[in-house]
Amino acid sequence: MNKRGKYTTLNLEEKMKVLSRIEAGRSLKSVMDEFGISKSTFYDIKKNKKLILDFVLKQDMPLVGAEKRKRTTGAKYGDVDDAVYMWYQQKRSAGVPVRGVELQAAAERFARCFGRTDFKASTGWLFRFRNRHAIGNRKGCGEQVLSSVSENVEPFRQKLSMIIKEEKLCLAQLYSGDETDLFWKSMPENSQASRKDICLPGKKINKERLSAFLCANADGTHKLKSIIIGKSKLPKSVKEDTSTLPVIYKPSKDVWFTRELFSEWFFQNFVPEVRHFQLNVLRFHDEDVRALLLLDSCPAHPSSESLTSEDGRIKCMFFPHNTSTLIQPMNQGVILSCKRLYRWKQLEESLVIFEESDDEQEKGDKGVSKIKIYNIKSAIFNWAKSWEEVKQITIANAWENLLYKKEPEYDFQGLEHGDYREILEKCGELETKLDDDRVWLNGDEEKGCLLKTKGGITKEVVQKGGEAEKQTAEFKLSAVRESLDYLLDFVDATPEFQRFHFTLKEMQQEIVKKQFQSKIHSRIGSFLKPRPHNIKDSFSGPSTSGSNH
């Protein structure tokens, strides 16, 4: 690149290139020479790296239009701008073309919602809005209203087949991922707990929702860590470093996937994990590393143009709208298998094996206490273990319809409704019916992303930047010690559990140490606390022991 004048301003695309050179370890002088910039401009770009990257990441197509845009400053009416752009992204993801007049009308509506009486969605505003978000004045690419869903499947198969041949992709390089809801604390209606405690009826429990994302390759040899979206940051009861958790956990107030969360996962997790798998497990040469990720068209997914690795060899492709149930591999028994396995583990932890002498009151009390103990940490680890146990053949079979037009073979041995009925009956849950079990097993089939209404978008923009929910309170050391004492008595009296004695004893000693430390700190704090003094002393004048003036 030719040298520029000293005060030449770089556009966003050029700034991104400068940042990539810095990341690659290029020297200050070589970057200055390539882009013709001064030392101060170089350091300004380096200092504003996060601002530049965040701005580009938020765009619908990161570098489309970036060659013209030079600033990352926001709009005067930021709330209106954010709301309109969120609305536009939803329409675009659904394949709905959006004209300029519709953007202006949406802006006027959101301005009224925010009480912006002086806002005008003028032609100038429209021009600036499109420029800010790199939205071209082009026709929409939505599917024709009258075309049936099935008619879209075959052209997609042909296009996919062509890409596979052109890119020379093998099954291990084809990936599919999909979102789903998980009502992690859900129990069947009419269970002991739901009849006993009015705070725990089936419908209430069902509101304990997480969103999950599963992704694997076509031969089932590479299953990526599942993403879990929860309502708040992980509680303090989950002591593990989040990087060591068996899932990727992200907080989101509405428990929905967003474009920002998905983009972050794609570039920080999917791309590097795929590279590592192909280089270290498949032993591919670096130049042979490539992958194609197939996704649904939903508001949580950015455009395919923006979901592309820097070298262009790891890409995304979207299924035609409304064809997910027909050809999306994850919906051909993979997600269902994972959920059935999860329900099994949940029952094992949540249900109580009742004694024959227990009456209905005792059964209800035990059931409620057990379900209350089942927490988000248990759900996360059980979900991760369930995903690990989904069979490779289950994933491979799920691609049969898409790739070979064959009906996939489902293997739900041990995961049918009757299998769950058996364990429920063993735990004394005789009042639940088979229909209750079916509703419970199939009750969380919704997607993990949502089309927001105008009110929902407004609410999200208003609440953006709000504080995360408070984390759960810490346990009392005295209560923990009491529980350990009780467990030690049980272990010492039960031969088959005596091997756990020293582990529990070690925990007990640590708790006692913490109790003593807590008391010492409390006493020191009391000793150091300033003593009250006479208020008159605070306003007393200087000493009069010296000479009088």
From Swiss-Prot:
This is Tigger transposable element-derived protein 7. Expressed in all tissues tested. Higher expression in testis and ovary. It is found in: Nucleus. Gene3D superfamilies: Homeodomain-like (1.10.10.60). Pfam families: CENP-B_N, DDE_1, HTH_Tnp_Tc5. Residues 1-52 form the HTH psq-type domain. Residues 169-399 form the DDE-1 domain. PROSITE patterns: HTH_CENPB, HTH_PSQ. Residues 28-48, 101-132 bind DNA. Residues 68-139 form the HTH CENPB-type domain.
